Amino acid sequence: MSSVAEDNSFTCDIATIFVAICRNPPANPSDSLFQYEISTLYQEAHSRWLKPPEVLFILQNHESLTLTNTAPQRPTSGSLLLFNKRVLKFFRKDGHQWRRKRDGRAIAEAHERLKVGNAEALNCYYAHGEQDPTFRRRIYWMLDPEYEHIVLVHYRDVSEREEGQQTGGQVYQFAPILSTQNVSYNQYIGDSSDIYQQSSTSPGVAEVNSNLEGSASSSEFGQALKMLKEQLSIGDEHVNSVDPHYIQPESLDSLQFLEYSDIDHLAQPTTVYQRPENNKLERCYGGNFGAQYSAKNDSNKLERCYGGYVGGAEYHSSNLMLVKNGSGPSGGTGGSGDQGSESWKDVLEACEASIPLNSEGSTPSSAKGLLAGLQEDSNWSYSNQVDQSTFLLPQDLGSFQLPASYSALVAPENNGEYCGMMEDGMKIGLPFEQEMRVTGAHNQKFTIQDISPDWGYANETTKVIIIGSFLCDPTESTWSCMFGNAQVPFEIIKEGVIRCEAPQCGPGKVNLCITSGDGLLCSEIREFEYREKPDTCCPKCSEPQTSDMSTSPNELILLVRFVQTLLSDRSSERKSNLESGNDKLLTKLKADDDQWRHVIGTIIDGSASSTSTVDWLLQELLKDKLDTWLSSRSCDEDYITCSLSKQEQGIIHMVAGLGFEWAFYPILAHGVNVDFRDIKGWSALHWAAQFGSEKMVAALIASGASAGAVTDPSRQDPNGKTAASIAASNGHKGLAGYLSEVALTNHLSSLTLEETENSKDTAQVQTEKTLNSISEQSPSGNEDQVSLKDTLAAVRNAAQAAARIQAAFRAHSFRKRKQREAALVACLQEYGMYCEDIEGISAMSKLTFGKGRNYNSAALSIQKNFRGYKDRKCFLELRQKVVKIQAHVRGYQIRKNYKVICWAVRILDKVVLRWRRKGVGLRGFRQDVESTEDSEDEDILKVFRKQKVDVAVNEAFSRVLSMSNSPEARQQYHRVLKRYCQTKAELGKTETLVGEDDDGLFDIADMEYDTLFSLP
């Protein structure tokens, strides 16, 4: 009994000392019971945040450390830097992108004053990465004015597990036990928080508050001592008098977990409990364990997650303890390896015996590996006996409950399913620690009301609409939607409605929630299901696409008769006699009864396809609608001018682009110009050339469309584009060659030619050379003979047209120059001067004569008074003297100014030209006489010919020449040429062909002196 009393009194003394230290902590770490190792702190800075006492110790001992004189550039995680703010002002410019305030200027740094003991000692500023929210920065300096210029900066990349533990709202921890040997300062001084520790010789409870206020009265201190004595008593009657679940919560920034390696062992076991109103026990061994307890028949359950999930195992607090081996005295029984191995076997057997009861006979395969890993990696073991430095699990947890949002995920009845899901290796399921972090958020910023759809196929992205309401300003941070552990951004469609895309994932159910940019939970958790996409779709979707003959002949016949009934309107037949000739033109193009019977017959015979039949019916419907539209806009008996507005005349461009040849002629009949241009200068021929409509191009050329028309200049095409260049850029080489040939021949026909025999011979020689080179390169196949013949004829026409156009411009320039020279020679022989000089003299004489009469008007008025001979003679003498005096005055003034000018020129010559530039100056200067002969390069017509005519002609001829090298282009040219001849015949404008074998081309060689010809 005496030994027990001594132990009891010794424990009370320890508690008294502990409370006294809490009331009056040391002023700085140098006065504490433990001195920190700087090298150890630098190593631990890579894996955890430093505690306020450790930071204070580094700042106070900065003189023995090296200060950084330059700002770092993108320091890595774990960097610990010391700065002097007075020397390096911009130490925050470290190259990283930090989250900024709403204005985007200043960095959004959170500020907090940290306590060492119960006194504020440090300033701390927190910053989060903009692109990587897990990368953090903390800046510390002391509140002491003497040391406030010394700054400690700590960079860390927080892992998901650590971030979840630190951002989960109120976090609870195991408090380390108090030892009588080698107690460090940071083991009993909290970081501006409360740490409660308990110690007893029996399964009792001890509680100590380390954050007692300095202004507490003596009565409070007495009550604390009284409670401490009761809790440290030996008897078991005081066990139930103390709250068995109490543990102090700590805030995010002040939470610091003590190292288990610094805890010494006591002779008696120790137990730590939580507060009942929180009903949650988390955090054991460095954050790798998550524990959950519930009471059933006075038994305790421990559900743990360490690289996996173990659920359903029942443990009794009377025979299960968590022991750390090797950290206390060697004489402890709990530290022996034999008993430790035996205890692991006992725990494994208990786990295997109890798991089937709670998981319906399924034993997790990771249980043995979990326990073996714990024993190998961490020196922690399970023992069946009471040993020193142990944590006992509580015996009475009947009131322990989980939050509603958490119980839905890890409730005891769902443990088996969740364990199986984790064992199957789900890619998107949340691990246990992440669930603890997500569900532990206390700041809800969004309320989910509905999710549509709430499922999607596993291997496809699904667009998901979430309806809810924001409980804060949506613009205050970046938001994301989390599907399991996959985080995707979303967009706010309108207030309370957001949209995102569910990522691809394996089949199964995952958690869906709204998170902020740093991964914090901001809403309740819903489920989203991923389903396997079935191989067979619905019957309608599985049907093959409609083939060319998918519609039955009976259905096609019914469709044809239905359209025929709609188009055979009796009222329109009654008004046919009132229609004009232009309206009857489109009516003639419509199908008659014979055509309808022919279409029905082809359907019955099976020779008509459904696609062609439907297209023909659509064309007939469009014909009827176009007839109605043109009739409504036609004027009564007035077809001289166009009856359509400028906007309505643009229909010709639509028709040309679509290739509706049947609609082209009725539109022309209503007065629309064939070369009508749109806002960009495009005509119908440009639109038809862009889409490669061969029939429409032939119809436009036959109707007189200009093949050389150029579009309006633009940034992309400063010189504009012709229809041939548009066709060539879209890959229609045959069409481009045909249009180029037509443009060249039309250009040649618009010129008035007076060719000589020499120019004709030159064009003929050039044409023969081109044709010979093409004939040598072209194949001699029979199927390509017809198209090759047409192509050679096109090249011949284009080559002769290009040569004759260029020769015509050269001849025109030559004639103009000769005419000018002949006129100059004629004038020089007759008058001794050129015509230009004569015209200038005559103009000056007129001006001089007029001015002279004005100047002599005063003299004439004077002469009227001196009509006598003597008076007139005196006047003339006086005037002569006055003129002489004026001449002398003017000469004197000119000579005076001339001297000044000569003086200035001499100064300029000597100072600038000779001395400064080291030249000869004006000595020996002779002005060059400008040549009056006009050079040929200054001829405006020649410049125009070089810039416009020659370039356009060469490009057109190159297109025709390149057409001959492609068989497809030759075939296309042959089709367009043949269609042109047919169109001309249909319009009654056929032209005389050269011979029966000729395919409608005129031979330019046979048109020697024609001043005007039109050749398409």
Swiss-Prot record:
Location of region: Disordered: 324-343, 753-786
Conditions for induction: By heat shock, UVB, salt, wounding, ethylene, methyl jasmonate, abscisic acid, H(2)O(2) and salicylic acid. Induced by cold stress.
Origin: domain of life: Eukaryota
Gene3D superfamilies listed in its UniProt record: 1.20.5.190, Ankyrin repeat-containing domain, Immunoglobulins
Annotated positions of the Phosphoserine modification: S935, S962
Signal sequence, renumbered to the chain: none
Regions of compositional bias (Gly residues) in chain numbering: 328-338
Keyword Zinc: no
Tissue: Expressed in roots, stems, leaves, flowers and siliques.
Repeat positions for ANK: 647-676, 680-709, 719-748
Family from the record: Belongs to the CAMTA family.
Protein name: Calmodulin-binding transcription activator 4
Annotated source species: Arabidopsis thaliana (Mouse-ear cress)
Lineage, broadest ranks: Eukaryota, Viridiplantae, Streptophyta, Embryophyta, Tracheophyta
